[in-house]
Amino acid sequence: MTVELHLGDCLEYMRTMPDKSVDAVITDPPYGINADKGVGGFGASKTDKHYQAGWDVTIPDIDYFDNIERVSPKLFIFGGQFFTKQVQPNGHWLVWDKVGDIKFKNPFGDCELIWTNVKRNSVKKYTVIQQGFIAEEKDRFHPTQKPIKLIKSMLLDYTHEGDTILDPFMGSGTTGVACVQTGRNFIGIEIDPTYFAVAERRIQEAQLQPTLPLEVNA
């Protein structure tokens, strides 16, 4: 199993990658939402630790989407509804249900859409509950950080052990941690040095953990 981490612009790096050189892209691109206004009316400020790195300033242009489609046969894009003009119209949707049967209101949204180009009969709904405003991880490093359990479920459902996964907007490295824990190779790219350092540390810590038997999703 290999891990490659690159600090820099993801588009510049992807332009050097051969066609279909990875097995899947799982990524959460910036949506271009104004952080001063918060998410879903919650009113978070850029003085919050999650906003200090200047995340979510611009939306990736069409070259980004052309390149992820070129380097990978399988695409999974969180917040895909923000990119309907950039992605292919024949895609499908995964649904991340953050609430399930629990009756509470999540100000960041009760569900999240993930655009994918996998076949329709493979699409699933994931119920990975984020109770309150905090993700399942003890430490939260990024404003849009996803639960490791969610990414692991997607990897087990749609990829194979030994596959290579690319995350062009690596953030705090959750996809990389999930790849280490499920025996996938990982290529992560992050332009922000602060988040890159966090991702590097988290992935290194995951590599030091003993390998546990995988729970294969049905």
Which stretches of residues belong to each language-model region?
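Class I S-adenosyl-L-methionine
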Residues: 17-27, 31, 35-49, 69-218
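Conserved SAM/SAH-binding loop
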Residues: 8-12
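Extreme N-terminal starter segment of soluble prokaryotic enzymes
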Residues: 1-5
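A short glycine-rich, Lys/Arg-flanked "PGG" loop and its adjoining helix->strand segment in the class I
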Residues: 58-74
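A conditional alpha-helix N-cap/helix-loop micro-motif detector
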Residues: 6-7, 57-61, 144
